[in-house]
Regions:
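Residues at alpha-helix caps and immediate loop-helix transition turns in enzyme cores, especially N-
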Residues: 15, 66-68, 100-101, 126, ...
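Conserved acetyl-CoA-binding loop-helix of GNAT-fold acetyltransferases
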Residues: 32-35, 152-159
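Catalytic strand-loop-helix junctions within cyclic-nucleotide turnover domains
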Residues: 6-11, 61-62, 148-150
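Short acidic-capped amphipathic helix/loop micro-motif used as an active-site/signal-coupling element
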Residues: 8-13, 37-41, 119, 196
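The catalytic core of metal-dependent phosphodiesterases that act on cyclic dinucleotides
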Residues: 3-4, 74-148, 161-196
Length: 196
């Protein structure tokens, strides 16, 4: 959903920041999410085999009873191998019915789909998520970059990155804007990817 853009004839490009709340308010976010999943899988099939696609799932979409069949269907109709699909969920998706959530994540993972925890460090952050759920990637929120040139924020960011890496997860830091930030987060080797 984060790359979703609407080219409005009068307003120009409308960003997901504006689209998503309207879709949620109108009860369209699940249908929109399903369309995005299918479209993303089909588009990824046009790309080189080494390239994968990450698709954000809203909490409403993730908690649909048919989420597993929707993912299977998108993979089947597109022909995309499951290992080329990464599903990004936020911490709010992990808050409700944790046993069922764990089961769904485990089944997605057994299909070969990769699971990422997006925007880690905001909202209801809990280190227990890193331990209790079958995640493969943690995406540390851009807010951790604020004041990164001083010791305390950098130590916190590196600590979360090291902990995640030690648990066998890939680590992404979101919101990288300068070479200095990239150098600071890359220094100890825990961060595997940077997202600008």
């Amino acid at each position: 959903i984060s790359l979703l853009r609407w080219n409005h004839p009068a307003r120009g490009t409308v960003s997901p920041v504006d689209i998503i709340p309207v879709a949620e308010d109108m009860g369209l976010i699940v249908d929109l999410g399903r369309w995005i999943l299918r479209k993303a899988c089909m588009e990824c099939m046009k790309w080189p085999e080494a390239v994968s696609v990450a698709v954000n799932f809203s909490p409403q979409q993730f908690h649909q009873r048919d989420v597993l069949s929707e993912v299977r269907y998108a993979l089947e109709v597109s022909g995309l191998p499951a290992h080329r699909l990464e599903i990004e969920i936020t911490e709010s998706s992990l808050l409700h019915n944790t046993e069922l959530t764990h089961d769904v994540l485990s089944q997605l993972r057994s299909l070969g789909v990769r699971i990422s925890l997006d925007d880690f460090g905001t909202g209801y952050s809990s280190l227990s998520y890193l331990h209790n759920f079958p995640l493969q990637k943690v995406k540390i929120d851009r807010s951790f970059l604020e004041g990164i040139d001083s010791d305390r924020p950098l130590t916190l960011l590196r600590g979360v990155a090291r902990l995640s890496a030690d648990l066998g997860m890939s680590v992404v830091v979101e919101g990288i804007e300068t070479n200095e930030q990239l150098e600071l987060i890359s220094a100890d080797g825990s961060v595997t990817e940077a997202q600008g």
